[in-house]
C-alpha cells in the first residue's frame, strides 16, 4: 500500500504483511508503516541480516536503532487530524466524493478525456487518464504546470501491441501561489 494507506477502511487481518510507503497520506517523505502478523515474522529466513528481519524491530519495540523522531511525531499529528475529521470512514467518504467529481468530468467529456480503469476498479487516490491526442496532452502538461498541477506524463505502460502513456495528476503548492490564486 502507498497512496491508499488511511484513505479507506482496510481489514488488516486479511494480510500477513502490509508495507506502506506512507509519505503521501501519513507523514513526511521516507515514512514507512509496516504491519505484520506474528506468524509471518516467524517465517523469516535465518540467513537474512539482522536489519532486514521485521522480527528484529518487532522484538525491540521498533527501537533496534535510532527511531526517526520527527517522522513519528508527524505521523502522530496526522493520525490525530484524521480522528478530528471523523475517522477513516469520513476520510474515505471525502476521498470518494472528490474522485467522483473528477471521474464525472472524464466520463462525460465525450472522449476529450479517456480514463483507463474500469469503473469498478477505479482508485480514489490515483486517477489516470489521457487526452484525445498527444498534442493536447503536451499542452495540458504545460498549462497544468502554470496552475500548480504536477503531471506525471512520463508514466508509460507496456501493452502487448504498443506502449500506452498514462497521465497522472496531483496538485502541488505553487511557487507563485499569490499571483496564481489572486482572483479566487
Range-by-range predicted roles:
Residues 36, 129-133, 165-167:
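Short beta-strand-to-loop capping motifs
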Residues 144-152, 181-184:
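A common structural junction motif
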Residues 1-17:
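Conserved PLP phosphate-binding loop immediately N-terminal to the Schiff-base lysine helix
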Residues 22-104, 118:
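Active-site C-terminal subdomain of aminotransferase-like
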Residues 17, 31-35, 126-128:
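Conserved hydrophobic/aromatic beta-strand scaffold that supports enzyme active sites
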Residues 158-184:
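PLP-dependent enzyme catalytic core of the Aspartate aminotransferase-like
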Residues 112-116, 148-154:
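A short linear hydrophobic-aromatic micro-motif
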Residues 113-143:
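Conserved PLP-binding catalytic core of the aspartate aminotransferase-like
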Amino acid at each position: 500500500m502507498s497512496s491508499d494507506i488511511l484513505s479507506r477502511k482496510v481489514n488488516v487481518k486479511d494480510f500477513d504483511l502490509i508495507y506502506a510507503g506512507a509519505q503521501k497520506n501519513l507523514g513526511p517523505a521516507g515514512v514507512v508503516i509496516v504491519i505484520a502478523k506474528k506468524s509471518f515474522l516467524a517465517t523469516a529466513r535465518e540467513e537474512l541480516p539482522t536489519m532486514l528481519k521485521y522480527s528484529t524491530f518487532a522484538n525491540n519495540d521498533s527501537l533496534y536503532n535510532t527511531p526517526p523522531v520527527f517522522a513519528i511525531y508527524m505521523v502522530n499529528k496526522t493520525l490525530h487530524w484524521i480522528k478530528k475529521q471523523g475517522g477513516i470512514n469520513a476520510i474515505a467518504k471525502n476521498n470518494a466524493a472528490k474522485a467522483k467529481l473528477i471521474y464525472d468530468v472524464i466520463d462525460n467529456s465525450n472522449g476529450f478525456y479517456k480514463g483507463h480503469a474500469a469503473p469498478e476498479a477505479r482508485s480514489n487516490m490515483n486517477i489516470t487518464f489521457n487526452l484525445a491526442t498527444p498534442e493536447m496532452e503536451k499542452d495540458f502538461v504545460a498549462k497544468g504546470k502554470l496552475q500548480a498541477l504536477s503531471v506525471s506524463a512520463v508514466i508509460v505502460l507496456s501493452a502487448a501491441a504498443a506502449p500506452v502513456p498514462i497521465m497522472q495528476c496531483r496538485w502541488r503548492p505553487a511557487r507563485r501561489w499569490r499571483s496564481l490564486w489572486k482572483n479566487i
